[in-house]
């Protein structure tokens, strides 16, 4: 799995709301503050003792793509090593229930036709999701080319695509160009599945609340 990248406070908010264990490689000052203040279970490759165990660096990626794109992990490694950390809670907290409900196997989504979805993130990054009726998945492209699984060489496909509308702004005084992204409150959005789209409303009461 990778490359594992640096944390931002809005990632931490989403992880906390889903009672997740958060793995990252470095992070913004705001992300570290959020991890410390909100009590997120986090493992950091850059400022922690986990490189060479939970994480490792791929030297070929480091040479060809840069240091920040070289950190990897795997599901097998995570499952094997997490129980060895005695301080870590491996079960969901009392009362936690997964907040989102998707279709059961064999059910088909209803809505207006949506065979291709183009999502512009910035002037240089646009995500495209093209519905493939044979697989029932949206095939992912970015930077004008297929987004490929490095293990299989196949184009990545996803069943569900959620587009959430929220406020995004540059952090005042941040020389690195980092952004503030609202993850709490409510907002409108779109849900794409099975080549169809439905309008939705999302909600997240506070940082510790799940996204619904």
Task: Label every model-predicted segment.
Residues 2-212:
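A surface/extracellular/periplasmic glyco- and lipid-processing/surface-interacting theme
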């Amino acid at each position: 799995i990778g490359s594992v990248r640096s944390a931002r406070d809005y990632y931490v908010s989403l992880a906390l709301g889903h009672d997740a264990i958060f793995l990252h490689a470095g992070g913004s000052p705001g992300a570290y503050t959020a991890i410390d203040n909100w009590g997120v279970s986090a493992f950091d490759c850059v400022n922690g003792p986990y490189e060479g165990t939970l994480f490792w660096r791929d030297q070929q990626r480091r040479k060809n793509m840069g240091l920040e794109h070289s950190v990897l992990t795997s599901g097998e490694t995570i499952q094997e090593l997490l129980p060895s950390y005695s301080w870590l809670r491996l079960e969901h907290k009392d009362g936690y229930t997964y907040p989102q409900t998707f279709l059961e196997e064999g059910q088909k989504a209803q809505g207006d036709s949506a065979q291709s979805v183009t999502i512009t993130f910035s002037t240089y990054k646009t995500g495209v999701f093209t519905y493939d009726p044979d697989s029932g998945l949206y095939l992912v492209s970015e930077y004008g080319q297929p987004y490929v699984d490095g293990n299989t060489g196949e184009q990545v496909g996803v069943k569900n695509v959620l587009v959430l509308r929220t406020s995004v702004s540059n952090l005042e005084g941040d020389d690195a160009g980092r952004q503030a992204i609202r993850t709490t409150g409510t907002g409108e959005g779109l849900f794409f599945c099975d080549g169809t789209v439905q309008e939705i409303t999302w909600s997240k009461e506070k940082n510790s609340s799940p996204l619904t």
